[in-house]
């Protein structure tokens, strides 16, 4: 296929046009008075969303070159989503502002490589400042405030997530399920999460999220490698196919031929099956398999205990209400075995007391936390499917933001942290940088106010005056866009996780500096229709 090649200013302008389109579509959602975006679906009802990265993923332009610009800035959003789970709209707005400022300087003859160095140094300075100003999250109130802001100023949701973290602990698992009513509720269930995922991607049931979700499955637990198809696998698969329920196999490993048999059965719809490697090593693996067996009411098929796969019966299999498996993790939500789980926890506690090795104690403590902590399940309620999807996305953002806040602390939200740090950056850059590097740092300085500017513009106010007032105030002071007042952000609970603010800025700066140093674009020539 023949190619189109664009150089210098033409190349950068084409990328910029694509970025303008994406940034405008995403930034209308920013802030408490941000609007929604409707996404058309080939099948089913349209989706209404308020989530930056979801919108960014949907935008494909007809012009190949402009589409390259869209793809580049989309990367800033999705990378931020991967690292922090929230702050994708802010990352998009920042990247767009930096490119806009930088394009003018490159067109005026500034050295793009020196600009890039300046942008990188400025970003590093801001990241260290954010870490210095961040406050640790100490109480439930701060957690609920972070969650409320991320869920689109929904105070009830914030309280619910704070409750969930209270109950399962900061390391605990919070999972989302579609509820049966219009009310969103929190439910504590017995459950555990371990760090092993599916063996083959062919088992995936939800391709968009790359997850396997199985409701009401049987669970086969074994501490051996499954190698023989005829003797070991087929009897089990025949048993399960009669019940028409899903099957989760947790084994030391599944050899190629046996794995191929499972995949074929899954793809042909004969048995809905998934295989997962057992967690841990050696004796710890056996102990963890026994923990899972007690949680799910099953038995570990182990030759030590005189069981084999050839003589398997249904009552040896565990059962769960729901199992969610990703590439890295497996979350089991079980119910109805409270008594057994409690006595197992007591047994582990006694082992902890008796153990004199600190490593051993730590590993036992991990097992106890996994078994006793349970899983908080938030059942998302909504009147329509469209509302359900929107709510789930918001809740996901809120859970991710809360975990990020616990990790790296909190800073004033609503774009005010970056606005305040713009002054510090200007002073630091003028003292430490020269020529085009200084210009690069000042590009970042001017861009730092863009999230706040957009939040204010989405409320219909004039941003210039408000931004100046905030710049001259204390670090805690910011703009409450919902009420249209300048307030102490910590007092009113408008706070962001430091990790979200930091990673949004880092990814925006990375993409912007790549675009500013672009001298040539090569894209496929479009067919004339």
Swiss-Prot record:
It holds the Pfam family Cpn60_TCP1. Disulfide bonds: none annotated. Keywords: ATP-binding, Chaperone, Chloroplast, Isomerase, Nucleotide-binding, Plastid. ATP binds at residues 29-32, 86-90, 414, 480-482, 496. Its EC number is 5.6.1.7. One of its GO terms (molecular function) is unfolded protein binding. Belongs to the chaperonin (HSP60) family. This is Chaperonin GroEL, chloroplastic.
């Amino acid at each position: 296929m023949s190619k189109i090649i664009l150089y210098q200013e033409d190349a950068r302008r084409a990328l910029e046009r694509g970025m303008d389109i994406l940034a405008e579509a995403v930034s209308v959602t920013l802030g408490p008075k941000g609007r929604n975006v409707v996404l058309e679906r080939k099948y089913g009802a349209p989706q209404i969303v308020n989530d930056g990265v979801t919108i960014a993923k949907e935008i494909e332009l007809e012009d190949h070159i402009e589409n390259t610009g869209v793809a580049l800035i989309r990367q800033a959003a999705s990378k931020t989503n991967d690292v922090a789970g929230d702050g994708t709209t802010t990352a998009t707005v920042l990247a767009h502002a930096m490119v806009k400022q930088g394009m003018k300087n490159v067109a005026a003859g500034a050295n793009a490589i020196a600009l890039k160095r300046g942008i990188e140094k400025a970003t590093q300075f801001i990241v260290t400042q954010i870490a210095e100003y961040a406050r640790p999250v100490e109480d439930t109130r701060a957690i609920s405030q972070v969650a409320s802001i991320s869920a689109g100023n929904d105070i009830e949701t914030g309280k619910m997530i704070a409750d969930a973290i209270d109950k399962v602990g900061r390391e605990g698992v919070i999972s989302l399920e579609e509820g049966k009513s219009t009310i969103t509720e929190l439910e504590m269930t017995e459950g555990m999460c371990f760090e092993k995922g599916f063996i083959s991607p062919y088992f995936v049931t939800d391709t968009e999220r790359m997850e396997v979700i199985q409701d009401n499955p049987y669970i086969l637990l074994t501490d051996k490698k499954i190698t023989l198809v005829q003797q070991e696998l087929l009897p089990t698969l025949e048993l399960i196919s009669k019940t028409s329920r899903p099957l989760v196999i947790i084994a030391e490993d599944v050899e190629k031929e046996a794995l191929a048999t499972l995949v074929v059965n899954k793809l042909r719809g004969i048995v809905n099956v998934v295989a997962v490697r057992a967690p841990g090593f050696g004796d710890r693996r056996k102990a963890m398999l026994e923990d899972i067996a007690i949680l799910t009411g099953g038995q570990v098929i182990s030759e030590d205990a005189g069981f084999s796969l050839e003589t398997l019966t249904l009552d040896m299999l565990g059962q769960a209400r729901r199992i969610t498996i990703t590439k890295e993790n497996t979350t089991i939500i079980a119910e109805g075995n409270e008594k057994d789980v409690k006595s197992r926890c007591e047994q582990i506690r006694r082992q902890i007391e008796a153990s004199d090795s600190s490593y051993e104690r730590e590993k036992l403590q991990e097992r106890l936390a996994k078994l006793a902590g349970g899983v908080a399940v938030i059942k998302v309620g909504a009147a329509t499917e469209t509302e359900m999807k929107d709510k789930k996305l918001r809740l996901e953002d809120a859970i991710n933001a809360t975990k990020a806040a616990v990790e790296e602390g909190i800073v004033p939200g609503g774009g005010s942290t970056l606005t305040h740090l713009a002054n510090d950056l200007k002073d630091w850059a003028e003292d430490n940088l020269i020529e085009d590097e200084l210009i690069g740092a000042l590009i970042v300085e001017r861009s730092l106010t863009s999230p706040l500017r957009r939040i204010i513009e989405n409320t219909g106010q004039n941003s210039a005056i408000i931004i100046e007032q905030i710049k001259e105030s204390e670090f805690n002071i910011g703009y409450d866009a919902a009420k249209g007042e300048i307030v102490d952000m910590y007092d009113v609970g408008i706070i962001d996780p430091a990790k979200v603010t930091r990673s949004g800025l880092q990814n925006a700066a990375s993409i912007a500096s790549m675009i500013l140093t672009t001298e040539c674009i090569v894209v496929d020539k479009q067919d004339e229709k």
